[in-house]
Amino acid sequence: MSSEKVLVGEYLFTRLLQLGIKSILGVPGDFNLALLDLIEKVGDETFRWVGNENELNGAYAADAYARVKGISAIVTTFGVGELSALNGFAGAYSERIPVVHIVGVPNTKAQATRPLLHHTLGNGDFKVFQRMSSELSADVAFLDSGDSAGRLIDNLLETCVRTSRPVYLAVPSDAGYFYTDASPLKTPLVFPVPENNKEIEHEVVSEILELIEKSKNPSILVDACVSRFHIQQETQDFIDATHFPTYVTPMGKTAINESSPYFDGVYIGSLTEPSIKERAESTDLLLIIGGLRSDFNSGTFTYATPASQTIEFHSDYTKIRSGVYEGISMKHLLPKLTAAIDKKSVQAKARPVHFEPPKAVAAEGYAEGTITHKWFWPTFASFLRESDVVTTETGTSNFGILDCIFPKGCQNLSQVLWGSIGWSVGAMFGATLGIKDSDAPHRRSILIVGDGSLHLTVQEISATIRNGLTPIIFVINNKGYTIERLIHGLHAVYNDINTEWDYQNLLKGYGAKNSRSYNIHSEKELLDLFKDEEFGKADVIQLVEVHMPVLDAPRVLIEQAKLTASLNKQ
């Protein structure tokens, strides 16, 4: 690398490595091939290209890699490649996931003369796909000059990190080989959260302390943006200091320590388990940290606590009852609040927590030993270990996992807001890759996916095998799209799938030389498997086919489906 100048592509990849990205995801295409050659020029053997089976799966993988590592990058090609990935980036945008989408586009000469090239719409508009992506990105940039490239790249990466949303970078096929100033690379990018206005922050702390002092039964609700904006420790410190009963939303699962003595369950508005609901809704002051109040995350907007008894902590504002304090970030506010409270006084008013984890219930209305959701999920929870990373699929798995209380340090990856079926398979690959690239590479990666969703994105198991990764894949075989059946069309043909797949040979079919597959029909078979030390080591890729009744479903899914069906008819 020159001490003064560096190739634009080399600059870009060096910056990505400095941010902690070690695997560049994507699919090669003629407009990005020359750029991909520059990955090796970074000069770090841990930094590498890791291809995907298709662009949509790649976007899903980038989403989950970012959840594990903090940020990710994926390279696609102009038009046909980038459009295939857009669904995945829409999910990352809505769920607040920082992904850098790099698109190889026609060279700068073609951009100026606009010939009738392949992968275009045939109308000479070479920016149309960039405009599409601009609606799903926090920012977009087009590199057509070496002079400005470094600045544009750095600004784009800062936006990606600060907003925790995808960004889009168009790189003409010749622009990766333009030269740009190398000197900024001497200073790694660091994006600390700006300090709050001290005067306003002091006012906010005082007002919150006053409301806590006046309350008789305060509680805390932890949501998705605690994880998205990396304030897990600040949130846990606040919980430990106050002893307030603490609930999580579906999107807030594993954002805090669920083995904490102050953890009191999952709150989903009207869909909450009745005993938890009664306790949660008896509060006279609800402190919501990192809220993201979507329909499936809130029981279709059925929170019972009024705004007059609510304080909301967000990444860029704080809301106290009806008053909004712009620019007061929870990242800095929570530690100030924790330091300011009178622990003895505050802890004295904290209601004792008497949380009991869900218990496995044997099958009702089915043959003895049949695996049902009431039994499976609490039983699955007993299999988990500290620091496991569990990816759950949209639909059955996302709702069933709510009955699992996670050990300390676990991470549950889900896509509750966007809800694209098939997401979890690509996400599993990205998560497992992220674990490998992390400071804790020995964590287990576990996927739970239904057979219907698996059929959409199964190809990414091939990439998982090709890269020597060893996740445990649970396939719930219940012969179709259960969540759709419950919403509409219980016995409709459009909710059926091909039920003749041979899951037991799936891993071998994708070329796995070392793998294990299990065909589980009964409670005893699954319990025996969970006791198997070899299985628990997760030293080879494994697939567990779990057979469940067609119309059996988790309680929360059944109730949510009723709400959704009713809403769809309005």
UniProtKB/Swiss-Prot annotation:
Q: Which UniProt keywords apply?
A: Cytoplasm, Decarboxylase, Lyase, Magnesium, Metal-binding, Nucleus, Pyruvate, Thiamine pyrophosphate
Q: Which cysteines are joined by disulfide bonds?
A: none
* Enzyme class of the recorded protein, top EC level: lyase
The protein's matches in InterPro entries, at most eight in alphabetical order, are given as:
DHS-like_NAD/FAD-binding_dom, PDC/IPDC-like, THDP-binding, Thiamin_PyroP_enz_cen_dom, Thiamin_PyroP_enz_TPP-bd_dom, TPP_enzyme_TPP-bd, TPP_PDC_IPDC, TPP_PYR_PDC_IPDC-like
Q: Can you name a GO cellular component term?
A: cytosol
Which residues participate in thiamine diphosphate binding? T396, G419, S420, I421, G452, S453, N478, K479, G480, Y481, T482, I483
GO MF, one annotated term: thiamine pyrophosphate binding
**Which subcellular locations apply to this protein?**
Cytoplasm; Nucleus
Which positions in this protein are listed as binding pyruvate? D30, H119, E484
List ligand-binding residues for Mg(2+): D451, N478, G480
| Entry-linked PANTHER family | PYRUVATE DECARBOXYLASE (PTHR43452), PYRUVATE DECARBOXYLASE C3G9.11C-RELATED (PTHR43452:SF36)
Q: What protein family is recorded?
A: Belongs to the TPP enzyme family.
Oligomeric state and interaction partners are given as: Homotetramer.
Q: What is this protein called?
A: Putative pyruvate decarboxylase C3G9.11c
Taxonomic source organism: Schizosaccharomyces pombe (strain 972 / ATCC 24843)
